[in-house]
Regions:
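A residue-level marker of the well-folded mature domains of exported/periplasmic proteins
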Residues: 4, 25-373
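Gram-negative bacterial Sec-dependent N-terminal signal peptides
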Residues: 1-25
């Protein structure tokens, strides 16, 4: 899971732009899913058009210059307790090592803005050349990031940018998965599993979190505009920090109040685990769940032929590599695109093993492999 960006205003702008600039989606879920992997549908937090991550490169000469700088980097997370953050860290560290850049710290704010501000201040005391980060709150953390920029630190952001900061001036760039595209993918996967009809529920993130808002907007818009026989009959927001437990309660209430519900979408894999728990408790072995983010627990459920029939996956390892390369752009004073994105990856049981390798750059875990039926 990745998250947090500007505001619902930015999200609304994004949704409006998508409505006018994107082609109409196909009514056939399989065809629509195939098309998703060839383009990025998300726009940046300020409406920027995406630049492909494949265009971000450094020459041998540029790498040599960076190595001679003996630069250091800090990685400041909003939260590290998931596979997404671990893969991001792995990608960042691997690419930084190739660039001769030492990682001096990785921090976890536990989704608390005040903790992240303290983490930034702690890292700044060590005078890093680079900070790669995802803000826990775009407004509450902005002053700390501005202080880092004023100190001359090269900032690269994951998914989200602090309020009042400008690309090319205050930070190098922001790198994101195609979160809107992954929301679209989850909608088509839901339709595919339900044969394009039935009642469904939505468990969304009840916070000013641009990335999760993109997912929600995309899922809901795609269902409403593309599948007229699928009815969204219940929606419930969750605020955390126990997202799995909150989703369990939300889904349980939906299953009790709307007994004809055939499917529930959860905004990322942690909440999806809560929906799985609710379905088990309710004895709803027929419930279809789709989500976003390829975590091990939802992958195991999918491998077993369980509740999770499909999900949209990010590419966090490659995202980390791209962020490290862009940090190199910052050190060199090389012009960088303001928003860089990686395409969505629809995942079902059929391509699960290969998708895990694509997402994490390591083979699927033994638990996943042994769960395949």
């Amino acid at each position: 899971m990745s998250f947090k960006l500007n505001s619902f205003v930015a999200a609304a702008l994004f949704t409006s732009l998508c409505a006018t600039s994107l082609p109409a989606l196909a009514a056939d879920p399989a065809a629509a899913l195939a098309a998703l992997q060839n383009n990025v549908q998300s726009l940046g937090p300020n409406g920027e058009k995406p630049e492909s991550a494949s265009t971000i490169t450094l020459s041998d000469t540029e790498l040599a210059k960076i190595k001679a700088m003996n630069a250091t980097a800090a990685i400041v997370f909003h939260y590290t307790g998931n596979d997404w953050a671990k893969a991001q860290t792995a990608g960042l560290k691997a690419q930084f090592a190739k660039m001769g850049i030492k990682v001096i710290g990785v921090t976890d704010a536990g989704f608390k803005p005040e903790k992240q501000v303290a983490d930034i201040e702690t890292m700044l005391a060590q005078k890093p050349s680079i900070i790669v980060s995802i803000p826990a709150d775009p407004a509450a953390t902005a002053s700390a990031y501005k202080a880092a920029a004023a100190q001359g630190v090269k900032l690269v952001f994951m998914d989200n940018v602090p309020k009042g900061m400008q690309a090319g001036k205050d930070y190098v760039s922001v790198v994101s998965a195609d979160n809107y595209g992954n929301g679209v993918a989850a909608a088509h996967l839901m339709a595919q599993a339900l044969k394009s009809e039935g009642d469904i529920g939505i468990v969304f993130h009840a916070a000013d979190f641009f990335v999760t808002r993109q997912r929600y907007d995309a899922f809901k818009k795609t269902i409403k505009e593309t599948y007229p026989k699928i009815n969204i009959v219940a929606e419930q927001g969750i605020g955390g920090p126990d997202f799995t437990g909150d989703a369990d309660k939300a889904a349980s209430a939906m299953l009790t109040s709307h007994r004809k519900i055939k499917g529930i979408w959860a905004v990322w894999d942690g909440p999806a685990e809560g929906v799985i728990a609710a379905a088990r408790t309710a004895g709803r072995d027929d419930l279809v769940i789709t989500t976003i983010d390829l975590g091990e627990n939802v992958a195991i459920d999918m491998a077993r032929g369980g509740f999770v029939k499909g999900l949209g996956a990010q590419r966090p390892y490659d995202q980390g590599v791209t962020e490290a390369l862009l940090a190199g752009y910052g050190l060199l004073g090389k012009a960088a695109p303001p928003y860089v994105a990686l395409p969505a990856l629809p995942v079902t049981k059929k391509n699960l093993i290969d998708a895990w390798q694509t997402v994490y750059r390591v083979p699927a875990t033994n638990k996943i492999k042994s769960s395949m039926r």
